[in-house]
Curated annotation (Swiss-Prot):
Name assigned to this protein: Lamprin 1.8-10
Assembly and oligomerization: The polymeric lamprin chains self-aggregate to form fibers and have secondary structures particularly rich in beta-sheets and in beta-turns.
Keyword Protein biosynthesis part of the UniProt annotation: no
Compartment(s): Secreted, Extracellular space, Extracellular matrix
Function: Self-aggregating protein that is part of the soluble form of lamprin.
Pfam families, per database record: Lamprin (PF06403)
Cellular-component GO terms for this entry: extracellular matrix; extracellular region
Signal peptide residue numbers: 1-19
Cross-referenced InterPro entries: Lamprin
Keyword Signal: yes
GO molecular function: structural molecule activity
Per-repeat ranges for Sequence: 41-45, 46-50, 51-55, 56-60, 61-65, 66-70, 86-90
7 X 5 AA approximate repeats: annotated span: 41-90
């Protein structure tokens, strides 16, 4: 768990170091309302949003709401998603009939249910 958190923090720092501020009404790549959004498919509301990328069947996207959002991935019919509300977010996984929401409200969340999809 500690190694996972450390890896996520490194990813967040790399994103902060490389993200490009985008403030535009262009909705194809970035939806912007007074925030910093990654120029590739980023969303954010008062926070930092990670970009959406596609890799041959693997789709990733991210959301940030006043915190750091980590990517969600669609893998073989299973869907996982990460959201952050004032903190670091863990996966919101939907797959094989199992819903596992992991949401943060100004703190770090622990898993609420098993996540089916591999991350």
């Amino acid at each position: 768990m500690a190694a996972t958190m450390q890896a996520l923090l490194v990813i967040a720092l790399l994103h902060l170091a490389t993200a490009t501020p985008v403030v535009t009404k262009h909705k194809v790549s970035t939806f912007s309302t007074g925030f910093l959004g990654h120029p590739v498919g980023g969303l954010g509301y008062g926070g930092l949003g990670y970009g959406g990328l596609g890799y041959g069947g693997l789709g990733v996207a991210g959301l940030g709401y006043g915190g750091l959002g980590y990517p969600g991935a669609a893998l073989g019919g299973a869907y996982t998603h990460h959201a952050a509300l004032g903190g670091l977010g863990y996966p919101l996984g939907i797959g094989a009939g199992v819903v596992a929401p992991h949401v943060v409200n100004s703190k770090i969340a622990a898993p609420l249910a098993p996540v089916v999809a591999a991350i």
